[in-house]
């Protein structure tokens, strides 16, 4: 990576450190804060009113740096569009003064619509394949719709306690370095990590700002699109075990309650289960991030020693 690119990435972090306090103060003046869902843990009640939609800042910094570094348009537009969906969700939540924003079907419809464009764009320069197996193009479109939208929502589910979604994303994105084939791929990894790290300075417990759906939906879409672009769909599964665990815990919880009338966990997603067991938020973030990275390292070690 050249000095120019490194300086651009460093500037993202520094600007984030400078901008976030101003963003937080501005949101407080407008009284635009997070509403806590009623079915969530009572431990979170004190967080109500905390400025949200912090994703606006790190997405903006990433897009500007991405344009400077001439990153692929798929990544830039993915951040913008999924960030926009999340912003609409946050906006509705704030205006209507409730924890839920857009309806689930509305978010999914918008996510599916844009993922079709992602699949079309990617197929202009790579073969229609899934996990290295050639498939009909319609199946690749379907796979892209499910993967990108699925990861977008998985990251959103993980964003339930201070710092969790951000640190899990960082520990999921960094391992892709080991399979990067060009400087552009390295840049695509760090162009999102650097401003996100500046966000995490203010999102660590007690959080002064939340990323909101603006940030979480965009992050999940970004990492899955990056994996598709670089033919790393299989690696994605091993680099994001916590995102998968959070999603699976919700599916199991809902299925168990519908079929058996019993809950498997004290609360889902599973990070809330550990909260109600008495784990502090810092411990959950540390343990989840460590396991996320450890599983990725084991996969890399296995792959490199085949």
UniProtKB/Swiss-Prot annotation:
Record GO terms (molecular function): metal ion binding; phospho-N-acetylmuramoyl-pentapeptide-transferase activity; UDP-N-acetylmuramoyl-L-alanyl-D-glutamyl-meso-2,6-diaminopimelyl-D-alanyl-D-alanine:undecaprenyl-phosphate transferase activity
Transmembrane segments: 1-21, 49-69, 75-95, 104-124, 130-150, 160-180, 182-202, 209-229, 234-254, 284-304
Family matches, as InterPro entries: Glycosyl_transferase_4, PNAcMuramoyl-5peptid_Trfase, PNAcMuramoyl-5peptid_Trfase_CS
Localization, UniProt: Cell inner membrane
Catalytic activity: UDP-N-acetyl-alpha-D-muramoyl-L-alanyl-gamma-D-glutamyl-meso-2,6-diaminopimeloyl-D-alanyl-D-alanine + di-trans,octa-cis-undecaprenyl phosphate = di-trans,octa-cis-undecaprenyl diphospho-N-acetyl-alpha-D-muramoyl-L-alanyl-D-glutamyl-meso-2,6-diaminopimeloyl-D-alanyl-D-alanine + UMP
One Gene Ontology term from the biological process aspect of the record: regulation of cell shape
Cofactors demanded by this protein: Mg(2+)
Annotated keywords: Cell cycle, Cell division, Cell inner membrane, Cell membrane, Cell shape, Cell wall biogenesis/degradation, Magnesium, Membrane, Metal-binding, Peptidoglycan synthesis, Transferase, Transmembrane, Transmembrane helix
Family affiliation: Belongs to the glycosyltransferase 4 family. MraY subfamily.
Name under which the protein is recorded: Phospho-N-acetylmuramoyl-pentapeptide-transferase
Organism classification: Bacteria, Thermotogati, Thermotogota, Thermotogae, Thermotogales
